[in-house]
From Swiss-Prot:
The entry's DNA-binding region: 30-49
Span of domain HTH tetR-type: 7-67
PROSITE patterns: HTH_TETR_2
Organism: Shewanella sp. (strain ANA-3)
Any one Gene Ontology molecular-function term assigned to this protein's record: sequence-specific DNA binding
A GO-annotated cellular component: cytoplasm
PANTHER family (alphabetical): ACREF/ENVCD OPERON REPRESSOR-RELATED (PTHR43479), ACREF_ENVCD OPERON REPRESSOR-RELATED (PTHR43479:SF11)
UniProt gene name: slmA
Pfam families: SlmA-like_C, TetR_N
Function per UniProt: Required for nucleoid occlusion (NO) phenomenon, which prevents Z-ring formation and cell division over the nucleoid. Acts as a DNA-associated cell division inhibitor that binds simultaneously chromosomal DNA and FtsZ, and disrupts the assembly of FtsZ polymers. SlmA-DNA-binding sequences (SBS) are dispersed on non-Ter regions of the chromosome, preventing FtsZ polymerization at these regions.
Keyword Cell inner membrane among record annotations: no
Family matches, as SUPFAM superfamilies: Homeodomain-like
UniProt-recorded name of the protein: Nucleoid occlusion factor SlmA
Length: 197
């Protein structure tokens, strides 16, 4: 029974951190400010997380679990190449839009001046997503016998760059320019171009 409050406190700390990232765009979050927001001492924060880097790692774990598990569901449920790509991009954009503070972590903005391994971990996450997109595009050739005129790795990079750009605009606009704004029209254009290649 004593474990449950500890887990809830950890979750509460991470929720407060994400909220502060949202309400304080461009500002660095200190443990003193976070402790004040949570309503505990800095020492109490460190009882749950040995360092601020571990707090950010907690957010990154949430991001990884949320995105990668949903991408696996898309891969299992959907077989159409273009629909899979659309759903993966849409997932990234909706996730960022629903979690503005966490979008600063995805974008790297919140990690400036923090431990290098945090930025490396986000880079690894995006590399995994790009690999998934590449796999989706390559499977088109296997299933349909017809691929693309451009290498699938180049196309996967282009698709991911589109999503990353939309997330960057969201962060830069202080969460005013929604990542999903005009997505349907943009996707129709992108899909048309992909199918032409």
């Amino acid at each position: 029974m004593a474990v449950s409050p500890k887990i809830n406190r950890r979750e509460h700390i991470l929720q407060c951190l994400a909220q502060m990232l949202e309400t304080s765009p461009g500002q660095r979050i200190t443990t003193a400010k976070l402790a004040s927001e949570v309503g505990v001492s800095e020492a109490a924060l460190y009882r749950h997380f040995p360092s601020k880097a571990r707090m950010f790692e907690g957010l990154i774990e949430f991001i990884e679990e949320s995105l990668l598990s949903r991408i696996n569901i898309i891969m299992n449920d959907e077989k159409d190449t273009m629909r899979r790509c659309q759903l993966v991009l849409q997932l990234l954009l909706i996730f960022a839009e629903r979690n503005p503070g966490i979008s600063r972590v995805l974008n790297g903005d919140a990690l400036l001046g923090e431990n290098e391994r945090l930025r490396s971990r986000i880079s690894t996450l995006f590399a995994k997503i790009e690999t998934q997109l590449k796999q989706i595009l390559r499977e088109k050739t296997l299933r349909e016998g017809k691929g693309f005129n451009l290498d699938e790795a180049i196309l996967a990079n282009l698709l991911l760059a589109f999503a990353e750009g939309r997330i960057a605009q969201f962060v830069r606009s202080e969460f005013k320019l929604k990542p999903t704004q005009h997505f349907d029209e943009q996707w129709r254009f992108i899909q048309h171009q992909l199918l032409q290649s």
